[in-house]
Amino acid sequence: MESIRVPKQWDSRKRFDFLLMDLDFSSSPGYPYLKEAPTIGQWLGADETGEFNQQRVEKLWFDVQRVLAGDYPHLFRVFIKDEPHKIAKAETNRWRMIVASSLPVQMVWRMLFNEQNLALNKNSARIPSKHGFIQCYGGWMTFLADLQSKGIKYSRDISGWDVGAPGFIFKIIGKLRQRWPGVSDSWIAAQRLVYDDAYENSNLIFSNGVVVRQLFGGFMKSGLFSTIADNSLAMVGIHILAALRSGMPYGHFAATGDDVVQSHVTEEYLQELGRLGCRVKEVLPRIEFMGINYSSQRPEPIYTAKHLANLMMKTCDLGDLFDAYGRLYGESRLFPCWAQLAAYMGVQMRSQDYYRFWYSNPWAATMVDWHL
């Protein structure tokens, strides 16, 4: 596996300044920074030239040092995600919760795990964790052919993974990360600190001001820098353990977050998954992965109703939104419906051939400007 070493000066000011540019400026800065500004970009005073308010940068650097010293009173902010929910979930108050860390903690996670997560992304074709998989430029065809050549034909739907995620698997992932090339004693100490904060002794603040303490190990926080990476590694580890305990062959397996596809499934294996904290709602005899159904040998988006609901709620530019859906539905039988809907709303989408070329042709990767 291609390795990207953890830098010797992983906790330096120079590295901190460099990684500031990788932040999502539209995301929340978490508690308590959100009291001063609703987004990271606004809190940092970011302008169009990439400059920041230096007083804010110095404050953030000071708080990063407090995190590394174990002297930062961190509260995860818990809120309901502003997105469409299924009626059945709404009626039973099963809302999609976001558990977001404070900006100084986000920065420490970036400083610790940036190279590791980047390596996992770059090597997704060779490892079970597939969060670096790129669907466009024909990537979906390579991915589907790889799964089929390995006999992968089952998908499983997991219920309540975030809250039910067991603590032991994150201890294993922590040990795995500690074996990475370039890791130092100071790095390991900081890794243990942030994993304890995230997976063992978390403090969470709700929108009404109530603060609670987590009294059990586990519980994946949806707003971590490594949420997808750690979830993917967790799925791999639990699969191996359940296969060992049930006597089922490991077979072939792929995971992105809690999305899983695999070549083997037995009743005993599913029972072991349940004992390990992974509650399987159903097993599907087809490949559904990362919101795409591949049953027709073409990528068909699964969450069309959610996409339509998003269209009614979004305040962004409709042209950009329909362009994004044009790419997502580029190979779909539903593309003409989206084109008609766009025209009805006064937006002229490009042709399906245009989007199909972008989605499925490797030559598309050589194009510099896709708006020509």
Where do the model's predicted regions map?
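Viral RNA-dependent RNA polymerase
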Residues: M1-L372
